[in-house]
Amino acid sequence: MLIKAQSPAGFAEEYIIESIWNNRFPPGTILPAERELSELIGVTRTTLREVLQRLARDGWLTIQHGKPTKVNNFWETSGLNILETLARLDHESVPQLIDNLLSVRTNISTIFIRTALRQHPDKAQEVLATAHEVADHADAFAELDYNIFRGLAFASGNPIYGLILNGMKGLYTRIGRHYFANPEARSLALGFYHKLSSLCEQGAHDQVYETVRRYGHDSGEIWHRMQKNLPGDLAIQGR
């Protein structure tokens, strides 16, 4: 097990997560006692206790007073905040994980973008106008793209969509920095933002669904061509 962590707490967290992932601590089983586990990992019990509480909040474990700590099936108990961790744990599955992430983004954005443009056009236009001054490089576009989708999610009037985008942020922006290094991707995105702005101005809300689906398809084709050179830094860094 190769762990790159910058602190005892970070090391303990990665050790436990990787042990769960590799079935050293399988879902449904009980973690070793606190004293045994702290000695096994090489950290103080105080540090271990803090790590266990954090992992419980993220859905990896269930802690109940007076009972042993139980390992969860994280697919059933965790949230979007573990996406980057999953990317680090299973490099071979990263392309599929990213495909699933982008598919979810397209599917939900057809709903919240249409709602934003129809019910809150001024807010939607304010969000889309931020594309007018973006610098022509990958980092700027990655931040812009995330902020536009997130901004339109909140502009829809349903903050739950915004919270979903918040949960995607880490892996989403890492993907974006790689994807938007391609000038074709930046050009396609600008065209998409401009099209949405035009539809908003015209009140053509019925065209939003197809516009978003088309962008998802076209950007997906660019992304699939780029996957052969997928960088290793999509995984989260050690704490």
From Swiss-Prot:
Residues 6-74 form the HTH gntR-type domain. Keywords: Activator, Cytoplasm, DNA-binding, Fatty acid metabolism, Lipid metabolism, Repressor, Transcription, Transcription regulation. It holds the Pfam family GntR. Its main location: cytoplasm. It comes from the Bacteria. It comes from Salmonella arizonae (strain ATCC BAA-731 / CDC346-86 / RSK2980). This is Fatty acid metabolism regulator protein. Residues 34-53 bind DNA. Multifunctional regulator of fatty acid metabolism. The lineage of its organism: Bacteria, Pseudomonadati, Pseudomonadota, Gammaproteobacteria, Enterobacterales.
